[in-house]
């Protein structure tokens, strides 16, 4: 009986100690931002979605303002490099693809930060050297306008886009480098090379940004596009005639990650923002805009987005080492006038 009592006392003490430690971590995170008053967030996350995150964050921490700069991953990377070279430091928090973040890490543009909430994430979702943590997954899929494409004609796999009937009638992002490089990694140079050469001959339309692609697909500007499924699900809820294929093999998947800028002028506020996005509350906001949260306790809002049901191929962790090569190849193939 005494042993049992001693064990209960020990367990209770450990539990209370863990709770006290967590509270101390949170208290220390809050103290600094109250002095800094703002955080600057450079992100690729679409305007509506980042606004939802900021609204939740500022409701919880009303003493802080968040300024958001949204652009493509490549443009954000170049902007941070340009600012750093000029000795100007504006960004506190960066959230881009793991490929872009790998490039920025290699250039010394990040500082290591291990958020308390990152403990809830699997090892594969966290940088080994603690420079960044994953916040959501982005799947590259084929989307189509159901009012323009008969059910029997709907493309299901990537090679379906080589059918002559789709010539000039499908669209993709003008910076689709991750998708391009991952298919090369998965299929091998020979198979992928033949596919992309044939795909370029199909004269796809190029647009800037997947949000725009999804909106134009819904508007009927083209019948088929390579899109992110969470944006298709958002449009479906608003009544748009769009759908996406769940059976493509592979479904290339990019991880969007969040990090603290190397010379963050409001580093304490930046840390608090990162910790919030990784928290269950922050990940629930990500879930509610139909994105795919990566905190294990928060499941996707749409069952079809359950990653275990899809033939996922993740963008290789070291792709940033080859990105210049892939960018050039992609542009040479698809940017021809």
Task: Show which residues each predicted segment covers.
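Bacterial N-terminal signal peptides
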Residues: 6-17
């Amino acid at each position: 009986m005494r042993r049992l009592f001693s064990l209960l006392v020990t367990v209770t003490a450990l539990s209370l100690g863990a709770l006290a430690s967590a509270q101390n971590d949170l208290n220390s995170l809050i103290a600094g931002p109250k002095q800094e008053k703002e955080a600057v967030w450079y992100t690729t996350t679409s305007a509506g979605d980042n606004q939802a995150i900021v609204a939740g964050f500022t409701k919880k921490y009303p003493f802080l303002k968040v300024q958001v700069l949204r652009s493509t991953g490549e443009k954000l990377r170049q902007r941070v490099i340009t600012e750093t070279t000029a000795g100007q430091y504006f960004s506190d928090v960066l959230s881009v693809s793991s490929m872009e973040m790998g490039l920025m890490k290699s250039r010394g543009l990040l500082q290591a930060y291990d958020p308390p909430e990152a403990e809830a994430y699997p090892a594969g979702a966290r940088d080994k050297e603690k420079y960044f943590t994953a916040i959501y997954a982005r799947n590259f899929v084929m989307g189509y306008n159901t009012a323009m494409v008969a059910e029997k004609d709907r493309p299901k796999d990537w090679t379906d886009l080589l059918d002559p009937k789709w010539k000039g009638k499908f669209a993709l992002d003008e910076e689709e480098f991750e998708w391009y490089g991952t298919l090369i990694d998965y299929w091998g140079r020979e198979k992928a090379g033949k596919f992309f050469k044939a795909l370029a001959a199909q004269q796809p339309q190029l647009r800037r940004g997947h949000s725009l692609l999804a909106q134009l697909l819904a508007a009927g500007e083209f019948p088929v596009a390579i899109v992110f499924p969470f944006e298709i699900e958002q449009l479906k809820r608003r009544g748009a005639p769009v759908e996406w294929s769940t059976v493509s093999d592979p479904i290339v998947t990019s991880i969007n990650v969040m990090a603290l800028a190397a010379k963050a002028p409001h580093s304490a506020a930046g840390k608090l923002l990162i910790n919030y996005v990784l928290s269950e509350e922050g990940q629930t906001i990500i879930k509610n805009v139909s994105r795919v949260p990566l905190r294990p306790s928060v499941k996707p809002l749409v069952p079809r987005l359950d990653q275990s049901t899809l033939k996922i191929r993740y963008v290789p962790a070291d792709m940033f080492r080859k990105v210049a090569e892939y960018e050039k190849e992609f542009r040479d193939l698809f940017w021809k006038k």
